[in-house]
């Protein structure tokens, strides 16, 4: 999945879209649209649409929910931010920078998983993270790969300034780039990581399992829309955890359908799931979302985004956007809360109250 903010283009495009398309206020309604893009942890969205599970839960609450696959990840978030969708699959980092940073109050309705090895820093030859000093590193700039690199460098007392530059490289070109003599190190995500590590001399220096719980994959929804239409949240969460139950039980038909939709086979999809910490039960998701570690993670993410100039247009500090947590606490500006981690609906699922 292209988990990235393409420089400041996404933010500028979003600002224009908001000015033209954002609704004045959320209203009670019966038809909803949700966008998603291909990634191991989000394949259930395609399955619950194709299988009729989403329709079943929507009908239970007397509403209609359309689940739409968007091939461009950043574009899906931009369209959500501009009001074309009521919800979208996104990482915590990209939610903070694009919709929340752009002034669209957004709620993490479902905390689905975190990357636990899917993203990695890879060196050509032997060595450790400290050996990146003085070397160029190829990655998708301003993406979770960039964030992973920053966290890795920090762990050994280095920063990006100690490198011989970061070279913005498309994920589509990453495998070919690693094979060239000029490229010494890359940061990318699966399935590219698995392919590159098959190359002779490729050494994994650091991966997302070294920062567990920091690259989080979510289903986020417009806060005002959710507040005006709680049945929308109930239907989405109910459908999601029905599919989680199928996955947890090893339902091969469901898993094979997800694998094929993501362009791999069952074995390949299971390999990707192995480096993804899926929260198959709502209770697990609630526990993670209520943890003391989440606010610290979001502060780290906000500082990274501010340092790169993408925490909202004209953000004066890393505290520009407020983030609220289930216990009522906040990080960032408590007077500008635009991102909310809310366990209400996941707790309903855990309690069997949907």
Model-derived regions, located:
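Bacterial N-terminal signal peptides that target proteins for export
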Residues: 1-12
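Sec/Tat signal peptide C-region and signal peptidase I cleavage site
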Residues: 20-26
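Pocket-lining segment of extracytoplasmic ligand-binding domains
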Residues: 94, 166, 172-267
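Short, glycine-/small- and polar/acidic-enriched structural segments
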Residues: 27-169, 184-190, 213, 353-354
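Solvent-exposed, polar/charged alpha-helical surfaces in well-ordered, non-transmembrane soluble domains
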Residues: 55, 78, 82, 96, ...
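Conserved C-terminal helix/tail region of periplasmic/extracytoplasmic solute-binding proteins
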Residues: 302-354
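Cleavable N-terminal signal peptides
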Residues: 13-14, 24
